[in-house]
């Protein structure tokens, strides 16, 4: 299934679950009518953990609380230039849910906006979860996969400061850099052909890729781009530089 969906395709869906992904201190209050807010600083992370944006313990139950069942169309979007929707899309994959990302995000929507509605509950998921889509630090050290870092070139090189305190500069040894904004063109993901060329230039002939960033959020942007480019053996390093870069 194509992980992207257009506005025209979205309008043709019957009773989709719409999730507006958000991260930061000022979440939006309105979105596509019928949407629910998917707050990466709230329900869609585990604040009891010492790393930011850790996956909630009951991920399947979380999606069920938003009314998601095995046959429910799920569409994720954001109003943050595509930085956050892919994270919710990836979490859905981990939970066994085949969601899609609205190409162009909220900016591509030309209809009216409405206030978000609370999670309705009532979902039932029986599909098998896919926990292997997330990797911990020991797995990243041991599995020999190529790590693709989605942070800026300056943060990767250690010439720009980290936004979170207590982290040293630099990158995971042996990793390569693909800053996540480069996969977008005016808010839309670049074409599969453009993304294929981009990944060939960065990863060569490697197909086993683990994506990292600051806290596992924008790593999912490059994971989405790799999926569109035809890569399949993909994972996200959950702790990312927030864990690896601890001083």
Kindly give the residue locations of the regions a language model identified.
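Cytosolic catalytic domains that perform sulfur/thiol-centered chemistry
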Residues: 1-247
């Amino acid at each position: 299934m194509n992980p992207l969906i257009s506005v025209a395709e979205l309008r043709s869906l019957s009773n989709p679950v719409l999730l507006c992904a958000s991260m930061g201190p000022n979440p939006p209050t309105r979105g596509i009518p019928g949407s629910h807010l998917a707050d990466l600083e709230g329900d869609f992370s585990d604040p009891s953990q010492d790393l930011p944006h850790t996956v909630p313990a009951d991920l399947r139950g979380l999606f069920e609380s938003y009314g998601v069942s095995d046959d429910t169309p799920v569409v994720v979007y954001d109003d943050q230039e595509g930085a956050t929707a892919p994270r919710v899309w990836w979490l859905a994959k981990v939970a066994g849910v085949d969601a899609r990302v609205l190409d162009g995000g909220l900016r591509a929507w030309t209809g009216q906006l409405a206030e978000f509605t609370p999670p309705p509950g009532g979902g039932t998921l029986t599909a098998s979860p896919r926990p292997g889509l997330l990797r911990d630090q020991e797995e990243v050290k041991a599995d020999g996969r190529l790590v693709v870092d989605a942070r800026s070139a300056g943060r990767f090189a250690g010439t720009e400061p980290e936004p979170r305190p207590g982290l040293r500069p630099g990158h995971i040894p042996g990793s390569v850099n693909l800053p996540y904004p480069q996969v977008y063109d005016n808010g839309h993901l670049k074409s599969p052909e453009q993304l294929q060329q981009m990944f060939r230039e960065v990863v060569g002939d490697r197909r086993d890729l683990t994506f990292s960033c600051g806290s596992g959020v924008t790593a999912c942007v490059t994971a989405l781009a790799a999926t569109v480019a035809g890569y399949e053996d993909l994972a996200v390093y959950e702790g990312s530089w927030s864990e690896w870069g601890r001083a």
